Amino acid sequence: MKVVLMGTPDFVVPIFDEIARRHDVLAVFTRAPKPVGRKHIITKSPVHIWAESHGLPVYHKPSEYNFKPDMVFVAAYGAILRDNVLNSAPCVNLHPSLLPRYRGPSPIRTAIKNGDAESGVCLMKMTNELDAGDILMCKKFDIDIDDTNETVEEKVSKIGADMILEDMAAPEKFPPVPQSGKIVYTAKTGVYDEIIDWKKSPIEIHNLVRAFGAGRKKINGTDVKILKTKMNGDRLEIITIQPAGRRPMDWKSFVNGLHGTEVKFGE
């Protein structure tokens, strides 16, 4: 099968790799390189790097699309497809939630932050409307109490690869079904979402840290990132912390560095 791939982040790469092993990839569309970090180093997306390592042509602008594949497969591409793409071939999107719950750009982080114990992966037909296409297939998986964005992405990669290969092998087995149920949208996330409110419950703070990989706040007047936590019954334990301008350390080392000063969790 001739296929065009569209995607950007890390968790998409294993899925694209499985497709490329079995099918003819005509082109890969991904986010253009952009400045990253404090030094604003121009950085290619994980999918861009993967495509180049496999000698596959890489494109960034929808206006560059001029292909006639048997399928367009999309996963976390970050943009709604234009009609020239939608009309060129069947377009299938992998979305990491149980649609129509958590449409939009941050379904995994939102599920973890909300403390959901279950999520899923859906394959759907692409339309002009955001994540609103008919469903071809959905599979559920559990979100454990200590799962993070990264570990859930690993689950999505494995399940998603199996799903798209199954669909490509026998698409007639998966007729499209309209989405049903309550529609819930997610929003783009940023540094502001990582700010901890100490008035929240221990489990809510734990969920925030594992959703975003860091919780930001002041402790004893110092800006810190709380990188890892765990629940001990109803209590929250801080495992790894990173004071501003320093390397990550365990909580005990941080407290020892206060030399007996009382730990004060600031606003």
Language model features: what each stretch is:
Residues 21, 54, 69-185:
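Donor/substrate-binding cores of folate-linked one-carbon enzymes
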Residues 32-52:
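N-terminal beta-loop-helix "entrance" segment that forms/cooperates
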Residues 28-31, 51, 61, 94, ...:
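Generic beta-sheet signal
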Residues 58-67, 231-233:
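Short acidic low-complexity segments
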